[in-house]
Amino acid sequence: HLSIRRQRQMCIRDSRRNHLHHRKTTMTKADIQLVRALADKRGRTEHGLFVAEGEKLIGELRTSHLGVRKIFALEGLFSGPEVEVVGTKEMERLSLLKTASNSLALVEIPHYGLDMRALAGRLTLALDDVQNPGNLGTIVRLADWFGITDIVCSEASADCFNPKVVQATMGAILRVRVHYTDLGGFLRQAADAGLPVCGTFLEGENIYGASLPEAGIVVMGNEGRGISDAAAATVTRKLFIPPYPAGRRGSESLNVAMATGIVCAEFRRQASTTGTGQA
């Protein structure tokens, strides 16, 4: 009888342990207020954090160089001291997406140095007031695909840690360094250092007939007005993406993210056929 009693006590103790291990935590009002604050750039700057959502992205974040401060997740997705298990209704209250995700992480915003010497042998994108979060997120993803590790943005460009941008990058934000600076000053320094500064213009040279450098700066302009006069003054090579067939009147312009994809593809195509393909 004593043995049976001990077995019952052990079963009860194990059951309690399992319950404590898997029990849902109580999400506080402060948690919700913090996540809501991080939807705004001012809040992200104040707290030094950004929001990432979804099991795949958060899984990548946990193995990256970025610091994950806290994870809110449905039961069974993640484990660790930074993980708080919440229910579906709580996730719906927390999520910044239209359709609530199964997990949300608070991640420390990284700070990268911008070294012109390090960029000398690479292809780098420069964004002149690209303001749509979806466009910026797509461009970061394109940069990652084409092996471009740095994007230099004007200070009026969209914030790369905006939740919409983070989601649109599909994890590429972990591998591409995005810098914000006085773009005109940066481009002047690049030109003075002898780096080719290329940009897309309607009066530019047909990109498919141009001999493109393996390394340099590629400037992409604002969604509405294109490349500003200040940035254009530093461009040493004007390029043009022609329509097909040549001279046909159709759409007035290309979406900046689409144009960036075409330009990057042609730069990398030429690098892979004529050079080392390492820029």
Language-model-derived ranges and their functions:
Residues 1-15:
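Single conserved hydrophobic/aromatic residue that forms the stacking wall/gate
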Residues 21-75, 157-158:
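Boundary-proximal intrinsically disordered activation/regulatory segments immediately upstream
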Residues 54, 131-139, 251-259:
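Amphipathic alpha-helical repeat scaffolds
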Residues 63, 111-204:
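RNA substrate-binding interface of SAM-dependent RNA methyltransferases
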Residues 80-91, 122, 214-217, 236-237:
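Active-site regions of enzymes building and remodeling cell-envelope glycoconjugates
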Residues 84-108:
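Glycine/small-residue-rich loop that forms an oxyanion/phosphate-binding "nest" at active or ligand-binding sites
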Residues 145, 160-172, 233-279:
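Structured adenosyl-cofactor binding patch, chiefly the S-adenosyl-L-methionine
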Residues 199-251:
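Active-site/ligand-binding-proximal alpha/beta "capping" segment
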